[in-house]
Structures are given as structure tokens and as C-alpha cells.
């Protein structure tokens, strides 16, 4: 049995431990606190876990107290301090949840131990890491606290800041009429707004406030997060000493800068003495491989190497996805050594598929909003499909690129939003209805005129004819690489295997090099063939048909491979694996 030591029992450490334990590895989880100490201690974050990360948690049967938690089904945005105030509400495609890390991390540790896991309580030093590395096949560091944070060098290329961009304060409260038991989960915690809403208020140059329902150690609560520009009028926390002073400062900031929220929290009370947190952090990306004094290498995960400001609520999502990417990479490694090259490849895969987008999204909001970005927020008041796209960017940040960062792309997005609403349908509901049709997932590839490899994720693929052998797929007219497919004579359909969901995400991003880290062979006319796909079809383009906002490509199959295996399935906005129907399982 291969052995893995995980240092740090936060969201990333505990989820990785549970995932690897289920895969049959010998796992040691090391924390500086027991489950009981975590549960009775102070809050550690302002976590809000969106649906994509929740899907990952459920894969390892991590489902703590979710029945008692209030789902977050929409995002409400308010922008003041601008010539024209902005206010709108948009639904999330799927609900988010916020469960106090004191609740879930303590429960996950207990679950890990109940399954037979080796849990140790120690304050880990670099010297101890050397000992762990000598007696384990792999060491994962999931905390950047103390001297452990110094073993991972700052990545200057990927780090945008060298100092804190916000002064952060977090407050968990309950109101007297809400009470503190899980049975009160249907109570309206959101003042004038609808229950189950993440309310995000922004004053350019001053700071932000956001609040959402959650579940803490005493039951349902409302979580309050203040993000003040350093040196500005919301930078008031240095003189605060006690929990009560913290609560009073929270209410005072609402009256002064977010008066539309003040009344809802006038009678708010702390959920417990540990329900406050304040501080400053410098958003930083670090090298994922740490080299210890004795030459041993360890792999950093989550906040240890990608530390984002809480402004966009990405921390818990980053931790969950980092755990997922790491566990998948470890599983695929089999009996091969966990060497430095593999460690870098594992992190780069996570960075390409997820972390670069969550980091870029957070960085864009930490910086002063540009004129076209304010225009997008304002236009969302008139275009619900645009508001929905912005709101769901908190769930999957790659979906807001490139139009959130590029002025020309932003204009195109505005035109698209206006056009989408002319058909009279609720675009979100129509897309959800179409999503009820389960499909496989493909990556369609070709070569550009200059010989570069081109690819995009698509599930709009189907067979057309057996004689001659024809297939079709339908790219969007807004796809950046559409011109490359128009100029090429051939393309390849690569049907992804169940364990290739990482590639599905990677090829669905606007990244410059989507093929980074992807093993490919070369097919007809040089089209890339992705290794590990359950089937590939090398096609000559025989027809293109205009079809609304998409183009229908018909290709004649010239060569194909049928490797077989379990395909990746997409349904209802998330990935699935094939399962034999129980009535036909016998």
C-alpha cells in the first residue's frame, strides 16, 4: 500500500484525506488541533461553496449537515458611489452552501478516523516534514501557516500583488427571532431581500460588503464579510479588541457605507464568542513544489500555494478543487514515483483548469473597476441573461473570460445578451431544459493555418449516416477558434473517458495553450488525437450549415479508433459517470 502524509486539516487536507482513503491509500492526516478544538475554536473563513465544488465534495461522500443549511439560490448586486446606482438580482444555476469550517472540518476529521485513518495532532515543523518525506511515498502540505509557508517560493509571474489589497473582517450573527437551531432553517435571514440570497454591495474606492445565510456550530446564521480598501474609511479594525467591539464596528460600517443593509442587522447578535475574524492577507501564488533542506520534495495544495483574497468567495472552492485534482492525479499515477516533475504537472493541471480563472476573477475585482466593467454591471439591470452570466461566474470563474477582461469582448457580450432575449424564452430555463438530455463529452481538434493545435470542448456531437459514414458537431459562432475550423479541411472528434473531465474543463477555457500537458498523437492532416479517449473520429469537413448562433459541421469519417471504456457524461450542468440501470443490472 502506498502511503501519503497530509499536513493541514482544513478543507483541502481533510477532503484529500477522505478521497485517498476511499481509493485505498494509507493516509496520515496531521493537524495542530483536534476535531473538538476546531469545533470550539474561532471561525477561520467566510466560506461559500458553489455548486461545482459541492459536486466534488459529494463524490467523496462529504455531505456535512447540508440538510440543515440554507441553500443560496441567487446573487443580489448593489453598486453605489457611482453616477448611477446599480441594483439587480440574478439566480444561480444551482444553489451554493455555506457551512462553517468548524462544523465540516471537524466532522470530516471524525469521519476519517472512523474509517480507520491515522490522525495525529502535532505542530509540524520543516524538520518534521523531512521525517514525513522519509517515511511516506508522498507528502502534501495544505497549510501555509508559520515556517511551512516559507518552503514554497513566491511565483512572481503569477502573483499580481505584493501587499494586502483589502482589510477583511468576518462576523457570524443571528437575530433574536431566528434562534439557533437547525429547525429554523426556513427563517428569512435576508432582511428585505429573498431568503437564500448572497447580497454583494460595492462602493468603488471604499470597499465591499457581502452577506449570505450559513450554518455554524450553533445552527443557522447570517455571515457578514467586510472588505475595506487599506487606508480608506472601512479600515477601522486595528483598534478593535473584543468580539463585542467587532460586532459594533460591523453595524457602524453598515450605517456609514451600506445603509440599505443596516436595518436588517440592527438587532443582530453574535452566534458565539468565536464568531469573528479580521486581518489582512497578500494574495499570492507560490511554486507548488517545496524543496526541504535535506533535498526532499513536497507538494503544496490550496492556500499553501494559491492564496486569494476572500472578495469573490473562491477560497473554499479552490481548496475543494485542489483536493480533487490532487487525488485524481495520484490515482492516475499508479505505482510510478511521485517525483518533482509529477508534482509540477499536477499543479499545472489544477492551475490551467481552475486556479488561474478563480485567481484572475478575484484580481479583477480587487483592482478598480474599469469603465466597461461598470457598463456590464449596469447593463445587467436590463438584461437578465447577462446578470445570470455574471452571477454564475462566482461558481465557475472561467465562464466570465474573456468578456470580463477585454473591452471588445465585453461589447460582443452585450450584443449577445440582447440578442438572446429576443426569442421570448427564459434563456436560463431553456438552457436548463436542454441540459436534461444527457450527452457524452468530446474535444474537437484541428490544425490552424500556421500549424498550431486547436481544440474546444463540445457535447453537440452525433452520428448522421452510416453510408457514407458522417458525423456532426455544432460550435458557437462566438467560439474564438471558429475561424481555424473554417480554414481547415479536417477535424477530429475525441470522445473523452470518464477520468478525463479535467481535459473537458481545460479545453472549455480561453487559455492560450489548451494542449499544455495533454498527450496527443497526430492524425489525418495533422489533427491532434487525444490519448486515452474512448473513441476518436478523424473527419474531412464536407458541409457547413448556418444555424442561428451556431454552425453545424458535417464531417465524413476517414479513420476511427474504438478503445472502449467508460465515457464521460454531462447532464444537468455537471459531470457524471455511466451506471448500469438497476433493472438491467442482473
Positions of the model-derived regions?
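Central beta-strand plus flanking loop segment that forms part of the substrate or channel wall
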Residues: 153-199
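Glycine-rich FAD pyrophosphate-binding loop
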Residues: 7-9, 21-42
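Basic, polyanion-binding surface patches
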Residues: 419-586
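Conserved N-terminal helical subregion
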Residues: 63-155
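N-terminal FAD cofactor-binding segment of flavoenzymes
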Residues: 33-79
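Conserved FAD/dinucleotide-binding core of flavoprotein oxidoreductases
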Residues: 198-276
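C-terminal helical "tail/cap" subdomain of flavin- and related membrane-associated enzymes
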Residues: 312-313, 328-422
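Conserved mid-domain beta->alpha element of the FAD-binding
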Residues: 6, 279-358
Amino acid at each position: 500500500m502506498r502511503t501519503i502524509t497530509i499536513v493541514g486539516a482544513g478543507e483541502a487536507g481533510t477532503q484529500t484525506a477522505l478521497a485517498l482513503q476511499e481509493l485505498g491509500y494509507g493516509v496520515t492526516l496531521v493537524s495542530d488541533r483536534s476535531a473538538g478544538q476546531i469545533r470550539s475554536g474561532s471561525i477561520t473563513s467566510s466560506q461559500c461553496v458553489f455548486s461545482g465544488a459541492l459536486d466534488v465534495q459529494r463524490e467523496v461522500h462529504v455531505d456535512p449537515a447540508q440538510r440543515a443549511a440554507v441553500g443560496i439560490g441567487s446573487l443580489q448586486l448593489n453598486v453605489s458611489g457611482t453616477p448611477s446606482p446599480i441594483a439587480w438580482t440574478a439566480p444561480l444555476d444551482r444553489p451554493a452552501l455555506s457551512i462553517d469550517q468548524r462544523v465540516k472540518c471537524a466532522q470530516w476529521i471524525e469521519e476519517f478516523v472512523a474509517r480507520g485513518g491515522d490522525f495525529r495532532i502535532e505542530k509540524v515543523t520543516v524538520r518534521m516534514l523531512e521525517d514525513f518525506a522519509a517515511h511516506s511515498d508522498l507528502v502534501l502540505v495544505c497549510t501555509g501557516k508559520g515556517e511551512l509557508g516559507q518552503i514554497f517560493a513566491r511565483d512572481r509571474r503569477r502573483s499580481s500583488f505584493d501587499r494586502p489589497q483589502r482589510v477583511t473582517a468576518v462576523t457570524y450573527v443571528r437575530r433574536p427571532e431566528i434562534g439557533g437551531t437547525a429547525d429554523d432553517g426556513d427563517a428569512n435571514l435576508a432582511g428585505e431581500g429573498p431568503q437564500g440570497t448572497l447580497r454583494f454591495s460595492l462602493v468603488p474606492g471604499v470597499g465591499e460588503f457581502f452577506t449570505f445565510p450559513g450554518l455554524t456550530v450553533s445552527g443557522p446564521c447570517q455571515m457578514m464579510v467586510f472588505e475595506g480598501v487599506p487606508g480608506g474609511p472601512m479600515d477601522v479594525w486595528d483598534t478593535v479588541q473584543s468580539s463585542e467591539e467587532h460586532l459594533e464596528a460591523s453595524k457602524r460600517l453598515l450605517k456609514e457605507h451600506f445603509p440599505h443593509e443596516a436595518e436588517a442587522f440592527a438587532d443582530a447578535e453574535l452566534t458565539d464568542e468565536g464568531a469573528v475574524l479580521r486581518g489582512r492577507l497578500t494574495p499570492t501564488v507560490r511554486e507548488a513544489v517545496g524543496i526541504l533542506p535535506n533535498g526532499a520534495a513536497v507538494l503544496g495544495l490550496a492556500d499553501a500555494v494559491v492564496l486569494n483574497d476572500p472578495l469573490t468567495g473562491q477560497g473554499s472552492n479552490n481548496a475543494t478543487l485542489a483536493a480533487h485534482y490532487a487525488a485524481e492525479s495520484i490515482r492516475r499515477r499508479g505505482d510510478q514515483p511521485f517525483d518533482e516533475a509529477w508534482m509540477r504537472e499536477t499543479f499545472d493541471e489544477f492551475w490551467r483548469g481552475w486556479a488561474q480563472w478563480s485567481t484572475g476573477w478575484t484580481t479583477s475585482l480587487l483592482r478598480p473597476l474599469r469603465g466597461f466593467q461598470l457598463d456590464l454591471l449596469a447593463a445587467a439591470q436590463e438584461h437578465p441573461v447577462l446578470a445570470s452570466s455574471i452571477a454564475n461566474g462566482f461558481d465557475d470563474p472561467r465562464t466570465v473570460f474573456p468578456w470580463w477582461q477585454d473591452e471588445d469582448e465585453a461589447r460582443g457580450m452585450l450584443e449577445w445578451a440582447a440578442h438572446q432575449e429576443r426569442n421570448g424564452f427564459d434563456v436560463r430555463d431553456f438552457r436548463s431544459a436542454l441540459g436534461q438530455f444527457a450527452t457524452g463529452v468530446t474535444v474537437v481538434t484541428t490544425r490552424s493555418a500556421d500549424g498550431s493545435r486547436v481544440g474546444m470542448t463540445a457535447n453537440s456531437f452525433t452520428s448522421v449516416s452510416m453510408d457514407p459514414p458522417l458525423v456532426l458537431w455544432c460550435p458557437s459562432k462566438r467560439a474564438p477558434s471558429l475561424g481555424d475550423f473554417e480554414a481547415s479541411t479536417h477535424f477530429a472528434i475525441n470522445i473523452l473517458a470518464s477520468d478525463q473531465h479535467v481535459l473537458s474543463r481545460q479545453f472549455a477555457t480561453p487559455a492560450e495553450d489548451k494542449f499544455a500537458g495533454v498527450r496527443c498523437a497526430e492524425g489525418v492532416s495533422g489533427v491532434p488525437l487525444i490519448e486515452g479517449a474512448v473513441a476518436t473520429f478523424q473527419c474531412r469537413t464536407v458541409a457547413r450549415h448556418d444555424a442561428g448562433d451556431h454552425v453545424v459541421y458535417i464531417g465524413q469519417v476517414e479513420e476511427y479508433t474504438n478503445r472502449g471504456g467508460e465515457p464521460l457524461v454531462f447532464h444537468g450542468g455537471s459531470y457524471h459517470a455511466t451506471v448500469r440501470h438497476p433493472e438491467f443490472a442482473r
